[in-house]
């Protein structure tokens, strides 16, 4: 559903830990 580029950008914006919990549920995926 989402490209790795999107996760990478979020990771740098908030951090792998926060991004995982914030982005995963929002898009319905798990980093």
From Swiss-Prot:
Family membership noted in the UniProt record: Belongs to the aspartate/glutamate racemases family.
pH profile of the protein: Optimum pH is 8 for both directions of the reaction.
UniProt keyword annotations, A-Z: Isomerase, Pyridoxal phosphate
Name under which the protein is recorded: Aspartate racemase
Disordered: region residues: 1-31
Cofactor(s) this protein requires: pyridoxal 5'-phosphate
Compositional bias segments (type: Basic and acidic residues): 7-18
Catalytic activity of the protein: L-aspartate = D-aspartate
The keyword Isomerase belongs to this UniProt entry's keyword annotation: yes
């Amino acid at each position: 559903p989402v490209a790795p580029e999107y996760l990478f950008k979020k990771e740098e914006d908030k951090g792998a830990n926060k991004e995982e919990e914030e982005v995963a549920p929002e898009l319905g995926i798990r980093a």
